[in-house]
Structures are given as C-alpha cells and as structure tokens.
Design a protein with these regions (language model features):
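Active-site-lining helix/loop region of Rossmann-like oxidoreductase modules
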Residues: 7-12, 127-128, 139, 145, ...
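Structural motif
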Residues: 3, 69-70, 98
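Residues in the short beta-alpha loop(s) of Rossmann-like NAD(P)-binding domains
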Residues: 10, 35, 105
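N-terminal Rossmann NAD(P)H-binding glycine-rich loop of SDR-like oxidoreductase domains
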Residues: 4-24
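NAD(P)H-binding glycine-rich loop region in Rossmannoid oxidoreductase-like domains
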Residues: 37-93
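Glycine-/Pro-rich loop/turn segments that contact NAD(P) or position catalytic residues
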Residues: 79-164
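Conserved glycine-rich Rossmann-like NAD(P)H-binding loop of the short-chain dehydrogenase/reductase
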Residues: 25-34
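Short, polar loop motifs at secondary-structure junctions
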Residues: 33-38, 150-152
C-alpha cells in the first residue's frame, strides 16, 4: 500500500485529487497544510493523516516525508521558490525521490504570441517563483520531478485536456481543475510515467489572446 504526501492540500485542485484517490485507490494520504482544521472532514477516514505545518519548515517537511512514496506539491504564491528549496532539502534528507510539482504556464517562457504577452503581465508577481523553482528542480537529478504547467483554470465539470512537452510552445488558454486533477491522479497511480519532465496542460481548441471569460 502506497502513501502520498500532499503539500498545499487545501487548494481546490488538490481536494479533487484527494477525493479521487480515496475513491479509486487504497493509498494512505498525508495532507499537509497551514491550517489543518480546514480539512477536518477527512479526519474520520483512517487512511488520512492531517498535518498542520508551514511549507518553509524543513524539519516539519522532513518528518512528514519519512514514510511516503510520492510527494505531490500544490503550493504556490510569491514565496514558491523558498518552498521548493525546502521540499528539495527535505526530500534529500529522507531519500524520497518522486515528486509531482504543480507549476504554471510561463514557467519555461513557453507561451507564444499575444496570450504569452498577456500572461506575463497577468501573473508577473508569481512567475519568478515558478521559474526559479524549475531551475532548482533541474539542478537535482536525483529527484524525479514531473512538473505540471496548467493553463488558466476553470471549474467546468469536464475532463478534456492535451499535453505539451517542455520544448514545445504552449497551446490553448484554459483547462479545468478536473482535468489537471485527472492527470495528477494518473501520475500517482503510475509514478513511472513522465520521469524528469515538465508538461503543459490545456483544453484543446481554446487558443486566443486571453481566456475566453476575461
């Protein structure tokens, strides 16, 4: 039986992943978040452990990783690079090697055209953290990280997405949280997929200068 550590477990996409893993697998889940009471509804489940902690706290991260098989990070914010360094330090200390890392479109300067220009301005406060995180992970060959770069997120009840590689221009402008969660669940179920890779996720046929709802 595997055990999965989910960092940033309160995030909407992460909660979709949690529910699907509980329904579709026998994996044990360690849910790491700043305020554990936010996910108290999972407390009665014997397969779930709630861990209250700061993503910068290397000692707490190290303790949380002690017996897990896969680390899935859904952290974000302007301090992301600091969080990423803490994750790397904890993984090296515990000998953990498999990481699923939620990044963002633009992390590799891969978004072309007017949408790329718009995206640079729309999330300019956050892109440095995503880009520095990509560099930090690239410098750790012993950590098998699959980085995800989703398009702008929707709450549409659909699973409809395509992937682009790290050397390919990004496609589309949007993707549903359900779609991103679906891909994360596939990686957790089959951790040998997409080793040492960075993948864009988008809904097909959503090209444009910005997401359609803006």
């Amino acid at each position: 039986m595997s055990k999965i550590l989910i960092l940033g477990a309160h995030v909407a996409t992460a909660q979709i992943v949690i529910d699907r893993l509980l329904a579709e697998t026998q994996a044990d889940l360690a849910l790491y978040l700043r305020h554990a009471a936010r996910l108290n509804r999972y407390q009665p489940n014997p397969r779930v452990t709630l861990i209250e902690g700061d993503a910068q706290d290397v000692a707490a991260l190290t303790a949380a990783m002690a017996d897990v098989d896969v680390v899935y990070s859904n952290l974000g914010g302007v301090q992301l690079a600091t969080f990423t360094q803490a994750i790397i330090t904890a993984m090296r200390a515990t000998g953990r090697t498999r990481l699923i890392f939620y990044s963002a479109l633009g992390a590799l300067h891969e978004v072309p055209g007017k949408f790329g220009q718009w995206n640079e301005q729309a999330i300019k406060a956050y892109l440095p953290g995503f880009r520095e995180s990509a560099k930090l992970l690239a410098a750790q060959p012993e950590i098998n990280a699959t980085q995800l770069r989703p398009a702008w997120l929707t709450d549409k009840d659909e699973v409809d997405y395509e992937l682009t590689g790290s050397k390919e221009p990004f496609k589309g402008t949007e993707v549903s949280r359900q779609s991103v969660a679906d891909f994360i669940v596939k990686l957790i179920k089959n951790p040998s997929l997409y080793p040492h890779d960075s993948l864009g996720l988008n809904k097909p046929h959503t090209d444009g200068n910005q997401p359609a709802w803006l």
